[in-house]
Regions:
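Extended, charge-enriched "interface" segments that sit outside catalytic cores
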Residues: 5, 47-232, 248
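Active-site cores of enzymes that catalyze phosphoryl transfer or operate on phosphate-rich substrates
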Residues: 189-210, 281-330, 334-341, 755, ...
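Phosphate/oxyanion-binding active-site loops and adjacent basic polyanion-contact surfaces
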Residues: 225-236, 317-329, 361, 425-429, ...
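Cofactor-binding active-site loop characterized by glycine-rich and histidine/acidic residues
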Residues: 249-415, 419, 627-679
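Conserved phosphate-handling catalytic cores of large alpha/beta enzymes
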Residues: 394-404, 412-448, 452-458, 466
Length: 943
């Protein structure tokens, strides 16, 4: 039997684990049963698939092992003729699988040829003598039988022309069949009508015309030219016009610097006069953007006209950190879909434009692919366009840029189809664009277009590329432009009159000279305030952090909501530990015991949902909570179903979203930032598993959260919950790097808080949505305080309180106090417990709950109460060079009353955030508490 199985594997090309080969045979059988080996035909006949319609491919794979013996015993076939039919079937499969390797993709003709013997006749035991014989086509060309000569020509035209398609790695049979039927129906002849051909030429003229205009008028200025990749503009035009016809209302575009100015003018319809002003140093910054940004980072939005009606286009703002804008775009798209109640995800679509080097090199690309079908992040598929100019700045050798054949191979991790297309064949480009859009709409899945092109100039216009790519640029300098070649082609075909191409060039230049918009814009009425799509951005932009807000909730309403979200249906069987948590929460709701952190946090969400706000809480393990405190998602121990108490308060599940994210910080945080910038009515929260891991998304924090408003005028209310505190868990589980966030603070760009009680957390979360503006909120959230016996709050504190920037010492007698200790967060309880043990009454402990904007006036007034206190001590758990000390010392100094001196008590300087051994942690903690409360000051140490 072992020999039989080995023979079976070899004869059926299963060797090497190529299980997809069996699926290909089955598809071939469905189209033409006689074209497969009789053994396989007998086996496939058992599925009754042709009579009943196609079946899931898994049914084939799951039976292969069991069927091997029976398949070998099946019919013996009908001789050499049948064998040749089978060989032709294998040839067809080879072209579908590997034809892209022979495709004419490189406009420069520099790509090294690939050895593809399996695309030749001899590999499949066929020869020139068979060329005039007819064989079953397997559906190629729409004919059941064809001469091998004609069939081979059709396969070459389809799979080795200007489009190289990779799709046989897709596991879903329906998707593979859909793609090869589309490709084979065209057969390499993309059949654009004359109007589309003329429009394609006009768009190429626009792409080239803008670059040449800028090149001659603003010599040497950076613009990151699209030249060489001009076909991007007709590609975008095709996708957007098809989107309009298919009912798409919004398209959100993300792209880096290459070609961005061209897309702004020729796709989104930015007035070229405004672009020229920017080249001349006359910027029209959003008045809310205090710093501004370079012109090739700026976003834009417009409504463009299509045959299907207006389509709103939004080009996302973009830093120079390549690909990081991708998840920001995806988050914005998801938000727009939810606002439109677009559950099918057909009305809002993302287009992401990448560079080849960044697409294969930046890890955030992989992270976003992994999110693309996850239920909390899916957007119905993204159209990816890789502007593949075959060079990354100065690096062009694939041996240096990647370890895969194609820059796009990372997309195969989610079985996305890839269409490689020669950028010098505009009609193939248009066909690929239309095919990609249709695939996205039909299958709600990502699709990649690899636009093979070149870069006519250097990385920027002041760069000399021949230094590092001498041979490539010898070819490029002699190479005609895509527009020139296509205009000549259309003139020869009689599609345009002689000289019409030149007339288009002149007409476009006249538009630029006149400062006229170069694409068709649509007039769209403003969204009325009564519309669910309306967002009052001007009001939020005018709001200030200092505007008074109330976070109080009527106590009766609070109790009602607390009872509602803590009453679990009888049919939901909770884990015993969770059942105990909810038993306690019901007691908290009744006022029998004070509320803990989890109770107050969930109740804050409930009050906001009840008021009409939405909630989106995302992060690793957020449903339960890393420290088992939240339990916002309950898992039935009998059925494994889940129950979300907060969803009792909303009419749509998406209004109360709690998502356990994939194990990514960078892409997920960026996604939530994008969501928050589009929907200010949702409390968007990203929680770190531990705050220490937030720096995995440092680029998001630096480029977007901290600076997005200053650079681009984009406001965000994203909340970061970052578990922070020193409990002896070592250097990777202690610090959210508070010092880094404080360093980023300026001009009221965000809030940084360290809440120490459940009531503070309750009012902090409510305040975030009740502010008259939107600012990122960075929270050093607790770990051990989640169950600390002293970290509790009453219902009255929740109902009637407010967020306190500063909490004074209610027990201190100002007349006795000689030393005032200032601190933030969990260390307060360490100080309080030690003070109580010592029986000290000459020390007051003040908690600074908001570190930015710093409450100077409040602290100065509080310190003034302690006229006999000569020493004020800032105490922190973090090492001296970390934490808040160096970032707030100037504020503390300012707040001192006459006769008061400032001191430091905390850990010594350290390159690592925390000690790795519990014994060291305990010793250091005891030392800093004693230094704060009783020990003499070491001011030399504090410098």
């Amino acid at each position: 039997m072992d020999n039989q199985l080995k023979q079976f594997a070899q004869s059926s090309q299963l060797a090497g684990g190529n299980a997809s080969y069996v699926e290909d045979l089955y598809e071939q059988y469905l189209v033409s049963p006689d074209s497969v080996d009789p053994k396989w035909k007998t086996y496939f006949d058992g599925f009754k698939g042709r009579e009943a319609g196609d079946i899931p491919h898994s049914a084939v794979i799951s039976h292969i092992a069991d069927a091997a013996k029976d398949a070998l015993k099946a019919g013996t076939g009908n001789g050499a003729g049948d064998e040749r039919e089978r060989n032709v079937g294998r040839l067809i499969t080879a072209y579908r699988s590997r034809g892209h390797l022979d495709a004419r993709l490189d406009p420069l003709g520099l790509a090294a040829p690939v050895n593809t013997p399996d695309l030749g006749l001899p590999f499949h035991s066929l020869s020139d003598a068979d060329l005039n014989s007819e064989f079953s086509t397997g559906g190629v060309g729409g004919q059941p039988r064809m001469k091998l000569r004609d069939l081979l020509a059709r396969l070459k035209a389809t799979y080795t022309g200007s489009i190289g398609a990779e799709f046989m790695h897709i596991s879903e049979v329906e998707q593979r069949q859909w793609i090869y039927k589309k490709l084979e129906a065209a057969g390499g002849n993309y059949q654009l009508d004359a109007d589309t051909q003329r429009r394609t030429l006009e768009r190429l003229t626009a792409a080239e015309g803008l670059e040449r205009y800028l090149h001659t008028k603003y010599v040497g200025q950076k613009r990151f030219s699209l030249e060489g990749g001009d076909s991007l503009i007709p590609m975008m035009d095709t996708i957007i016009r098809n989107a309009g016809k298919d009912g798409v209302k919004d398209v959100v575009i993300g792209m880096a610097h290459r070609g961005r100015l061209n897309v702004l003018v020729n796709t989104l319809g930015k007035n070229p006069r405004k672009l020229f002003d920017e080249f001349e140093g006359k910027f029209e910054h959003d008045e809310h953007a205090s710093a501004g940004d370079v012109k090739y980072h700026m976003g834009f939005s417009a409504d463009v006209a299509t045959d299907g009606g207006p389509v709103h286009l939004a080009l996302a703002f973009n830093p120079s950190h390549l690909e990081i804008a991708d998840p920001v775009v995806a988050g914005s798209v998801r938000s727009r879909q939810e606002r439109r109640k677009d559950t099918a995800r057909k009305q809002v679509m993302p287009i992401l434009i990448h560079g080849d080097a960044a697409f294969s090199g930046q890890g955030v690309v992989m992270e976003l692919f992994q999110m693309s079908q996850a239920r909390g992040f899916a957007v119905g598929g993204t159209v990816h366009i890789v502007v593949n100019n075959q060079v990354g700045f100065t690096t062009s050798n694939p041996l240096d840029t990647r370890s895969t054949r194609y820059a796009t191979d990372v997309a195969k991790m989610i079985a996305a189809p890839v269409l490689h297309v020669n950028g010098d064949d505009p009609e193939a480009v248009v066909f690929a664009a239309q095919l990609a859009f249709e695939f996205r709409q039909k299958f709600a899945k990502d699709v990649v277009i690899d636009l093979m092109c070149y870069r006519r100039w250097g990385h920027n216009e002041a760069d000399e590329p021949a230094i590092t790519q001498p041979l490539m640029y010898q070819v490029i300098r002699k190479h005609p432009t895509t527009r020139e070649m296509y205009a000549e082609q259309l003139e020869k075909a009689g599609v345009i009159a002689a000289g019409a191409g030149k007339a288009m060039v002149d007409a476009y230049r006249e538009k630029l000279d006149a400062g006229e918009v170069t694409t068709e814009l649509a007039k769209v009425e403003k969204t009325p305030p009564s519309s669910p799509l309306f967002v009052d951005w001007p009001k939020l932009l005018e709001g200030k952090l200092s505007d008074p807000v109330s976070t109080k909730v009527e106590k009766n309403k609070l109790v009602e909501l607390a009872k509602l979200i803590n009453t679990i249906p009888d049919e939901v069987q909770l884990h015993s530990r969770v059942a105990k948590v909810y038993d306690d929460r019901r007691k908290m709701a009744a006022g029998e015991i004070p509320g803990d952190w989890g109770f107050a946090e969930n109740l804050a969400y409930a009050t906001l949902l009840d008021e009409g706000h939405a909630l989106r809480l995302v992060g690793q393990d957020v449903g339960r909570g890393t420290f088992t405190h939240r339990h916002a998602i309950l898992h039935d121990q009998k059925t494994d179903n889940y129950y979300m108490p907060l969803r009792q308060l909303v009419d749509s599940p998406e209004k109360a979203t709690v998502i356990d994210s994939l194990l990514s910080e960078e892409a997920v945080m960026a996604y939530e930032y994008g969501f928050s910038t589009t929907d200010p009515n949702t409390l968007c929260i990203w929680e770190g598993q531990f705050g220490d891991f937030a720096n995995g998304a440092q680029v998001v924090i630096d480029q977007f959260i901290a600076a997005g408003e200053a650079k681009w005028g984009r406001i965000s209310g994203l909340t970061l919950l970052l578990p922070h505190g020193y409990e002896g868990q070592g250097p990777e589980h202690s610090s959210a790097r508070l010092e880094r966030f404080l360093q980023l603070c300026a001009l009221e760009n965000m809030l940084v808080v360290v809440p120490s009680t459940p009531a503070q957390a309750f009012h902090m979360l409510r305040r975030q949505q009740h502010l008259t503006t939107r600012k990122p909120l960075v929270v050093m959230s607790p770990k051990s305080l989640l169950r600390h016996k002293l970290a509790v709050s009453s219902l009255d504190e929740l109902a009637n309180g407010e967020f306190q920037h500063l909490i004074g010492d209610a027990n201190a007698d100002a007349k006795k106090v000689k030393r005032v200790v200032l601190c933030s967060g969990k260390v307060y309880y360490d100080l309080l417990e030690d003070q109580t043990k010592r029986g000290q009454d000459d020390v007051a402990i003040i908690r600074v709950e908001q570190l930015y904007p710093f409450p100077r006036a409040l602290l100065a007034a509080e310190l003034k109460k302690y006229g006999k206190a000569t020493d004020v001590v800032w105490t922190q758990e973090e090492p001296q060079n970390q934490g808040a000390w160096y970032q707030i010392r100037h504020h503390l100094q300012f707040c001192l009353a006459d006769g008061q001196n400032l001191h430091y008590a905390g850990r010594a300087r350290s390159a690592s955030p925390a000690a790795g051994h519990m014994a060291d942690h305990v010793r250091e903690q005891q030392q800093l508490v004693a230094d704060a409360l009783v020990n003499p000051f070491n001011d030399t140490f504090a410098e």
